[in-house]
């Protein structure tokens, strides 16, 4: 029957031809649809993984470049610029129909505002810690936040911690101890004022501790609040950045020095354009992280995304050794390796826990929204 149909498609009925014409056109064979090259490229799993890793590295390096300037002290201004850039970027993407999120609603904003305050505390303390610590040490210490979140889940949401997860936590603590010891050892043995260097490191560790507490509070609070609002990927990013702008503006004008001398010190004429470009690029990179993380989950899987997040710590830490003067010593490299292994073990523990029937779930066991993940990635990187 199928063969008859094929034959009929190409049969010319002679009695229906115009007798005065010697030419006729037979029906063309059906054209087989071909996938567009752009679609094939967009569904290539390697591309979103590389884009996600590159965005995370760019965010951390740009922030460190701005914050490592001589006596930079306008952290609230930096965060405000990043939020404004982010809002402009996602509004442009929404107008271009690249992404979608719900329109502003005053009632939803009121419910979400406490989470925004926790976010401001998280990103501000993260910027202060990154200002005093090297990128590798900062990346290693951010792992401790995972422990706080996990046990917060156990206390407030009925989560559970497996033996393999506990082992990864032990590796995280060990890597942090090695990193701190390597940092202090290098400060004492290097030339210059060792006391001042150790004092700077101690300030960084204090800010890092506060940041871990703020980050875990933000993540746990967001999980509870998101049930009331049912926010999705870019809804969270939109409200977080929009609501933080007025708060950051008030904080920068009230608490930071806006004298002409301090502005010149923070933005020296020789580096002014580079610093401003880095501030804008760091704001854009948060959008890139959010978009590429959602892309990565869509094209690959949440399991692959978890492993990419764990493996991503290594290139981020190495970027600090390449682009900045982070000490390259055996203890510092050992701390990076142990921290890297702890991330892999934790990712494997999450995957195994997801494969079992769930009586309780760790905070990052289920796929989280891309915007929430990007916020954590950008500041734990």
Swiss-Prot record:
Coiled coil: none annotated. The chain crosses the membrane at residues 41-61, 72-92, 111-127, 135-151, 161-182, 201-221, 234-254, 275-295, 304-324, 328-348. GO terms for cellular component: cytoplasmic vesicle membrane; endoplasmic reticulum membrane; Golgi membrane. Residues 1-40, 93-110, 152-160, 222-233, 296-303, 349-381 are cytoplasmic. Glycans are attached at residue 262. Its main location: Golgi. It is found in: Golgi apparatus membrane; Cytoplasmic vesicle membrane; Endoplasmic reticulum membrane. The keyword Repressor does not apply. It is a multi-pass membrane protein. Residues 362-381 are annotated as: Disordered. Pfam families: UAA. GO terms for molecular function: GDP-mannose transmembrane transporter activity. The keyword Flavoprotein does not apply. Involved in the import of GDP-mannose from the cytoplasm into the Golgi lumen. Belongs to the TPT transporter family. SLC35D subfamily. Homooligomer. NCBIfam families: nst. This is GDP-mannose transporter. The lineage of its organism: Eukaryota, Fungi, Dikarya, Ascomycota, Pezizomycotina.
